[in-house]
């Protein structure tokens, strides 16, 4: 019975949820760790500042490999208006400071290795933050060598986060740098994925089902009456981060395979995604100062941004940092309920990582900025989970739902995630951000063999014909080696979602006119005031004949820059007949160049609700319907092209087979924004918005006609019975009764007469008063009242 109850809980949960979360887990043990030896800053004074360009070399002990990092300032990691807000333990603003770019030596560049011949060969990218320069430099960051990421961390950080089975350190005093590779993490022989306890036999405990035990792979058909769950949104685990993650509207399996490697929909020119980060008390407490905490956040974003730049042409840029004091409050403030000491339900506590995400999401929902998303940095974990993220919430403002401390299943969904501090925090951050951009997990051996995922539609396959991606990419369900890029499938999925508008992109800005923290900096890839163009450093500008990388001015005769302006062809403005953005259908008209500018006009689409075909309407620039979206997303699991929407009311994708009209099929999906829903409203981020009470009543009546008819008939019958009862009662009260009247003792009157009948008898014997004499004879019992002359007609006697 217990197993049966558990199974029911799993099915009910999986079948009813439409928004969900992904959870990362900590890495497994390290097989090897190296010490960074002989670091040298190649400047005359061995000194650098925030705007320096320099080379940095060092050895990897004990391999003795010589590494060179060719570095330059990363100016676009901080926005011009970037600030840090210091909060007190109650969540009130203590002070606000501008983040000065000169205070943060943040660099980007390329990694090189030296061959035995002495020749340097470029082998990857590098992102570094310099803590100390001089003859004994100290830096942290990440670089890649042939797609294998190399993490450089300070000894103090390694000691604090060291796993029990990690290699021990010697007794060398002082602070120095350590390095480990992705390939140094313990791996299974079959797939190269990290071994974890979470990968053991799946557990099924209804009491802890809410988050990391959930799987949105389960889509069994359920009767409608059994398809109600207390959960409004779906949370799944990312590591084993967990089965999958697909929030919002996710393309079906055919779409995932068809878009592998496609960048159609992603920006052709650099875009900037502004983000906000909050450091809670547990995170701040791991650093010697608030300045160190700030530097670590900048380092994390600096490293993660490179993956998005290379894959999607989007830079992640810090707009605001909030830092809470290192001393955690005894009782969390209502202003910052997420700011609590570490607590774990599994260990008898009551505040999990999922609770932090819920309360943080509610906090983020009150912010009025235009940031792409917000991240909460913490030092807490739940068991071995180190990250959670809501799916497909890029650029989403506000919040759906509200966390209730009395109800563990209540959830608030917003553009937010939670990242725990680890020795590879940047990877967790990049992975969680990938879910906010709408990516599902890459397929691994477990997902490919899952019987509830027969067509591999809930994960990104390696190729159209191969399921298992073998743990090589950023959206792998578990941490693994050589993870430095998104898979071709993830790139295709995110780009296609941008093209189809199943994620918002309105918060992404162009690199033109974006102020950076350092003001005008030629070579940072952002076109600022006083610059015509900026193609980046000289390496990035190779082959660019339109822009001079040294002056950031157009070359002689150039009107625009092909690399940064969509309406620029051969350094000249494209003609007005040039299509700079193609149409994706009848609801998305093409845009053409103006002929006098290098910029493509804003992307516009037809108004939602407009007719675009038989039984089709425009929604988010697509010509579609509820039935068509059901066919696209769940058709291969239901009835193919015969699949139809279960009803016309909600915004979660619920479908049915016409042959089984009472069986409801659901997935972790929502209808496109602009799709009609109940009460005359339209779907917006998974919620029905704009409905009216009158229309909702009308819709409810139309959806429940049998009930309405039954109630009406029953009420009518009761009313008729009541009326009939009243009529019968009234009739009984008014019916005359045949009762004998008592004798009336009254003086008899002489019968009336009329002159036409002659004189009455004994007329000659009148009484002295002239009145006829009275007969002493009583009238009959039932005689009518006496008639009086002039009032009643005379009575005739026979």
Swiss-Prot record:
Cysteine disulfide links: 395-495, 448-459, 580-600
Gene Ontology biological-process annotations: proteolysis
Domain called Disintegrin: residue spans: 519-608
Record keywords, A-Z: Disulfide bond, Glycoprotein, Hydrolase, Membrane, Metal-binding, Metalloprotease, Protease, Signal, Transmembrane, Transmembrane helix, Zinc
Residues in the Cytoplasmic compartment per record: 728-798
Main location: membrane
Biased composition, class Pro residues, residue ranges: 775-792
Region spans: Disordered: 734-798
Glycan-carrying positions: 32, 226-227, 313, 407
Record field: transmembrane: 707-727
Membrane topology: Single-pass type I membrane protein
Subcellular location: Membrane
InterPro entries: ADAMTS_CR_2 (IPR041645), Disintegrin_dom (IPR001762), Disintegrin_dom_sf (IPR036436), MetalloPept_cat_dom_sf (IPR024079), Peptidase_M12B (IPR001590), ZnMc_ADAM_fungal (IPR034028)
Residues binding Zn(2+): 431, 435, 441
Extracellular-facing ranges: 24-706
Active site: 432
GO cellular component: membrane
E.C. no: 3.4.24.-
Domain Peptidase M12B, first and last residues per copy: 271-510
Swiss-Prot/TrEMBL cofactor(s): Zn(2+)
UniProt function note: Probable zinc protease.
Protein name per UniProt: Disintegrin and metalloproteinase domain-containing protein B
Gene that produces this protein: ADM-B
């Amino acid at each position: 019975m217990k197993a049966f109850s558990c199974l029911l809980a799993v099915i009910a949960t999986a079948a009813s949820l439409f928004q969900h979360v992904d959870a990362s887990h900590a890495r497994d043990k390290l097989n090897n760790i190296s010490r960074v030896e002989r670091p040298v800053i190649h400047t005359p004074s061995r000194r650098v500042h925030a705007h320096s360009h320099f080379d940095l070399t060092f050895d990897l002990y004990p391999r003795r490999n010589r590494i060179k990092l060719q570095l330059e300032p990363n100016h676009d990691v901080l926005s011009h208006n970037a600030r840090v807000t210091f909060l007190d333990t109650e969540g009130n603003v203590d002070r606000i400071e501008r983040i000065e770019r000169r205070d943060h030596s943040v660099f980007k560049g390329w990694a090189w290795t030296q061959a035995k011949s002495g020749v340097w060969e470029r082998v990857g990218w590098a992102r570094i933050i310099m803590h100390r320069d001089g003859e004994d430099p100290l830096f942290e960051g990440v670089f890649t060598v042939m797609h294998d990421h190399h993490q450089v961390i300070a000894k103090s950080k390694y000691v604090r986060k060291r796993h029990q089975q990690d290699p021990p350190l010697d007794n060398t005093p002082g602070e120095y740098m350590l390095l480990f590779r992705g390939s140094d993490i313990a791996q299974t022989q079959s797939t190269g994925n990290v071994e974890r306890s979470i990968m053991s036999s799946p557990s099924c405990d209804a009491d802890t089902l809410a988050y990391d035990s959930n799987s949105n792979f389960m889509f069994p058909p359920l009767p409608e009456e059994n398809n109600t769950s207390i959960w409004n949104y779906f949370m799944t685990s990312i590591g084993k981060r967990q089965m999958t993650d697909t929030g919002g509207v996710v393309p079906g399996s055919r779409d995932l395979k068809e878009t592998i490697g496609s960048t159609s929909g992603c920006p052709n020119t650099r875009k900037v995604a502004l983000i906000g980060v909050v450091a809670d008390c547990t995170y701040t407490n791991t650093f010697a100062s608030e300045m160190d905490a700030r530097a670590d956040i900048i380092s994390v974003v600096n490293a993660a941004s490179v993956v998005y730049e290379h894959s999607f042409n989007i830079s992640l840029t810090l707009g605001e940092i909030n830092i809470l004091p290192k001393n955690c409050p005894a009782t969390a403030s209502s202003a910052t309920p997420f700011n609590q000491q570490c607590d774990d339900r599994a260990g008898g506590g009551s505040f999990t990582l999922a609770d932090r995400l819920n309360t943080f999401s509610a906090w983020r929902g009150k912010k009025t900025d235009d940031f792409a998303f917000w991240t909460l940095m913490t030092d807490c974990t739940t068991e071995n989970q180190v990250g959670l993220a809501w799916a497909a919430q890029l650029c989403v403002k506000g919040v759906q739902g509200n966390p209730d401390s009395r109800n563990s299943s209540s959830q608030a969904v917003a553009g937010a995630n939670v990242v725990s501090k680890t020795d590879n925090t940047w990877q967790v951050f990049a992975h969680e951000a990938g879910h906010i951009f709408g990516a599902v997990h890459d397929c691994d051996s477990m997902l490919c063999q899952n019987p509830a995922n027969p067509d591999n539609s809930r994960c990104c396959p390696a190729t159209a014909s191969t399921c298992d991606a073998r743990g090589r990419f950023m959206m792998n369900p578990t941490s693994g080696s050589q993870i430095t890029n998104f898979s071709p499938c993830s790139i295709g999925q995110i780009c296609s979602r941008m093209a189809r508008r199943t994620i918002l992109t309105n918060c992404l800005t162009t690199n033109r006119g974006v102020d950076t923290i350092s003001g005008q900096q030629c070579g940072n890839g952002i076109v600022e005031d006083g610059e015509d163009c900026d193609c980046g450093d000289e390496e990035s500008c190779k082959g660019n004949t339109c822009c001079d990388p040294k002056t950031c001015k157009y070359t002689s005769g150039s009107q625009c820059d092909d690399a940064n302006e969509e309406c620029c062809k051969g350094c000249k403005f494209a003609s007005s007949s040039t299509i700079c953005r193609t149409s994706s259908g009848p609801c998305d008209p093409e845009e053409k160049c103006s002929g006098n500018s290098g910029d493509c006009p804003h992307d516009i689409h037809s108004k939602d609700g407009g007719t675009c075909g038989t039984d089709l309407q425009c929604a988010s620039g697509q010509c579609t319907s509820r039935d068509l979206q059901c066919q696209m997303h769940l058709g291969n699991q239901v009835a193919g092209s015969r699949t139809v929407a279960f009803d016309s009311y909600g915004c979660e994708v619920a479908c049915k087979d016409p042959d089984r009209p009472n069986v409801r099929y659901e997935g972790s999906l929502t209808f496109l924004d602009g799709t009609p829903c109940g009460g005359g409203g339209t779907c917006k981020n998974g919620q029905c918005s704009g409905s009216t009470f009158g229309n909702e009543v009308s819709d409810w009546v139309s959806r429940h006609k049998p009930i309405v008819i039954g109630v009406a008939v029953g009420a009518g019958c009761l009313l008729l019975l009541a009326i009939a009862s009243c009529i019968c009662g009234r009739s009984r009260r008014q019916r005359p009764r045949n009762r004998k009247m008592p004798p009336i003792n009254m003086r008899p009157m002489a019968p009336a007469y009329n002159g036409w009948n002659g004189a009455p008898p004994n007329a000659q014997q009148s009484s002295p008063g002239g009145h006829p004499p009275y007969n002493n004879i009583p009238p009959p019992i039932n005689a009518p009242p006496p008639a009086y002359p002039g009032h009643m007609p005379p009575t005739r006697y026979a």
